[in-house]
């Protein structure tokens, strides 16, 4: 009689442990994904702060002064065509 009771108890404990393992397998990927996401956010934040990156300064553009003078070609053409 005691052997049957022990067998039933072992079987019940085995079923409980299997249910527990299945529930862990379902919840573990969620926790793992959340922890990996937090880790990546921390790494990105730390690397961004450590790089001390500055915005690039806009390049200084110089314009040739001859381009700023009104061209005389248009006025000459108007004079030629108007005559």
UniProtKB/Swiss-Prot annotation:
Its main location: host cell. It is a lipid-anchor. Residues 1-50 form the signal peptide. It is found in: Host cell outer membrane. Keywords: Cytolysis, Host cell lysis by virus, Host cell outer membrane, Host membrane, Lipoprotein, Membrane, Signal, Viral release from host cell. The keyword Membrane applies. It comes from the Viruses. GO terms for biological process: killing of cells of another organism; viral release from host cell. GO terms for cellular component: host cell plasma membrane; membrane. Belongs to the T7likevirus o-spanin family. Component of the spanin complex that disrupts the host outer membrane and participates in cell lysis during virus exit. The spanin complex conducts the final step in host lysis by disrupting the outer membrane after holin and endolysin action have permeabilized the inner membrane and degraded the host peptidoglycans. Host outer membrane disruption is possibly due to local fusion between the inner and outer membrane performed by the spanin complex. Homodimer. Interacts (via C-terminus) with the spanin inner membrane subunit (via C-terminus). Part of the spanin complex which spans the entire periplasmic space. The spanin complex is composed of spanin inner membrane subunit and spanin outer membrane subunit. This is Spanin, outer lipoprotein subunit.
């Amino acid at each position: 009689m005691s052997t049957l009771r022990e067998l039933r108890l072992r079987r019940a404990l085995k079923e409980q442990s299997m249910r527990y393992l299945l529930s862990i397998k379902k919840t573990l990927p969620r926790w793992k994904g959340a922890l990996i996401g937090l880790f990546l956010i921390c790494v990105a934040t730390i690397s961004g702060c450590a790089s001390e990156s500055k915005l690039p300064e806009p390049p200084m553009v110089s314009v040739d002064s001859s381009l700023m003078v009104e061209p005389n070609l248009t006025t000459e053409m108007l004079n030629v065509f108007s005559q």
